[in-house]
């Protein structure tokens, strides 16, 4: 008897929140991170929000140190604590954004994937490709139960 491997080949967390209304840009990005599982509810270590915000605002390729410097400036200007700004954590959060296809690495710099609109990225990369594959596999398991 073959024992199946319980390690997922792909995994995604999606959450539904209230409709957006009169929110700051940072709060909208925070909701996107919460909705796509990049940020956990109640998590105060939200540097991923600032990374995403900075890459969206700058619309250019930035290296890790430039991103980190921009995070420090942004958090200081908004009087937010400097939690989670270690270079290793910034790189880890960039990797998570890359895994969700929002960010791509070009040489040693990062940018929004193909400088594309986020709605298009979500529809093309996550909805049609990533989510479709997961749903198809769940259906395979359901069909096997017949």
What are these regions (language model features)?
Residues 95-109:
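A short, conserved structural fragment
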Residues 61-81:
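Short acidic, hydrophobic short linear motifs in intrinsically disordered regions
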Residues 117-146:
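Short, amphipathic alpha-helical interaction segments positioned at domain boundaries
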Residues 85-86:
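Short coil turns linking two alpha-helices in DNA-binding domains
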Residues 14-63:
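Short alpha-helical segments that sit at the start of domains
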């Amino acid at each position: 008897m073959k024992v199946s491997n319980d390690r997922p080949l792909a995994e995604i967390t999606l959450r539904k929140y209230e409709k957006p209304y009169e929110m700051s840009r940072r709060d909208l990005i925070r909701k996107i991170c919460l909705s796509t599982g990049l940020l956990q509810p109640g998590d105060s270590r939200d540097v991923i929000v600032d990374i995403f915000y900075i890459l969206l605002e700058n619309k250019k390729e930035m290296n890790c140190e430039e991103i980190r410097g921009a995070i420090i400036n942004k958090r200081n200007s908004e009087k937010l604590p400097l939690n989670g700004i270690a270079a290793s954590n910034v790189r880890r959060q960039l990797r998570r954004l890359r895994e969700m296809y929002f960010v791509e690495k070009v040489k040693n710099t990062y940018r929004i994937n193909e400088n594309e609109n986020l709605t298009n990225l979500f529809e093309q990369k996550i909805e049609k490709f990533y989510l479709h594959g997961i749903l198809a596999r769940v259906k395979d398991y359901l069909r096997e139960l017949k």
